Swiss-Prot record:
GO terms for cellular component: cytosolic small ribosomal subunit. It comes from Vanderwaltozyma polyspora (strain ATCC 22028 / DSM 70294 / BCRC 21397 / CBS 2163 / NBRC 10782 / NRRL Y-8283 / UCD 57-17). Gene3D superfamilies: Glucose-6-phosphate isomerase like protein, domain 1. One of its GO terms (biological process) is translation. The gene is RPS0A. The keyword Hydrolase does not apply. It holds the Pfam family Ribosomal_S2. Keywords: Acetylation, Cytoplasm, Ribonucleoprotein, Ribosomal protein. Residues 209-252 are annotated as: Disordered. Belongs to the universal ribosomal protein uS2 family. This is Small ribosomal subunit protein uS2A. Required for the assembly and/or stability of the 40S ribosomal subunit. Required for the processing of the 20S rRNA-precursor to mature 18S rRNA in a late step of the maturation of 40S ribosomal subunits. One of its GO terms (molecular function) is structural constituent of ribosome.
Length: 252
């Protein structure tokens, strides 16, 4: 697929994809994923062509941007590593997120409270989100999926080849997809300027680590407050001593 020069993969984005291990695929290769294999390492790990990954990100972004109502796009992730990325993607693009367990019948049973009629769905893993893909096939909803080399491609219309097992890889692909959608919609006009949002915002964070970090910040804040109180008390003592000395001098 030939793209205009403005859609070419930049060295900065290529470095991001490599740093996030997006190019590290599975050892097994599904037949439809063979065109995306760059080479195979001696340890048996297949390397994904990041140029193909970028082309599919651009294609998926153009499909998403073509839908007039952003809420008609449904971003889905039942995998833990992709839930934060799905929520951030939806917050930035206006899509409808489904983070966590997908309720069966959400696309086919209009009686359920979670019933939705999206025009497009994006899933993080065809294996974990198989229920959403299956129901989408019943009601003719196009499917965009982040696929590894061994992922099933049945009922998937646009496959973005990437490492969909790593938390950094998943977050980065969702980040690049959101950025490209905003560029096509005109929210980000200048392609030469970096997006103000950092990719780290899309990465999964362990709740225990977040709580530990918050506790450390609270402890440091409390220590700083105690130090400031001690400094204030020392200043007050010095001021009172100085006032007493002046009072004695005046009385004398």
């Amino acid at each position: 697929m030939s793209l205009p020069a403005t859609f070419d993969l930049t060295p900065e984005d290529a470095q991001l994809l490599l740093a996030a291990n997006t190019h590290l695929g599975a050892r097994n290769v599904q037949v439809h994923q063979e065109p995306y294999v760059f080479n195979t390492r001696p340890d048996g790990v297949n390397v994904i062509n990041v140029g193909k990954t970028w082309e599919k990100i651009v294609l998926a972004a153009r499909i998403i941007a073509a839908i007039p109502n952003p809420e008609d796009v449904c971003a889905i992730s039942s995998r833990t590593y992709g839930q934060r990325a799905v929520l951030k993607f939806s917050a930035h693009t206006g899509a409808t997120p489904i983070a966590g367990r997908f309720t069966p019948g959400s696309f086919t049973n209009y009686i359920t409270r979670s019933f939705k009629e999206p025009r497009l769905i994006i899933v993080t893993d065809p294996r974990s989100d198989f229920q959403a893909i299956k129901e989408a096939s019943y009601v003719n909803i196009p499917v965009i999926a982040l696929t590894d080399l061994d992922s099933p491609s049945e009922y998937v219309d646009v496959a973005i080849p990437c490492n969909n097992r790593g938390k950094h890889s998943i977050g980065l692909v969702w980040y690049l997809l959101a950025r490209e959608v905003l560029r096509l919609r005109g929210a980000l006009v200048d392609r030469t300027q970096p997006w103000a949002i950092m990719p780290d915002l899309y990465f999964y964070r362990n709740p225990e680590e977040v709580e530990q970090q918050a506790a450390e910040e609270t402890t440091s804040t409390g220590a700083d407050a105690e130090e400031s109180k001690e400094e204030v008390a020392e200043g007050q003592n010095e001021a009172s001593e100085w006032a007493e000395e002046n009072t004695e001098a005046v009385s004398w």
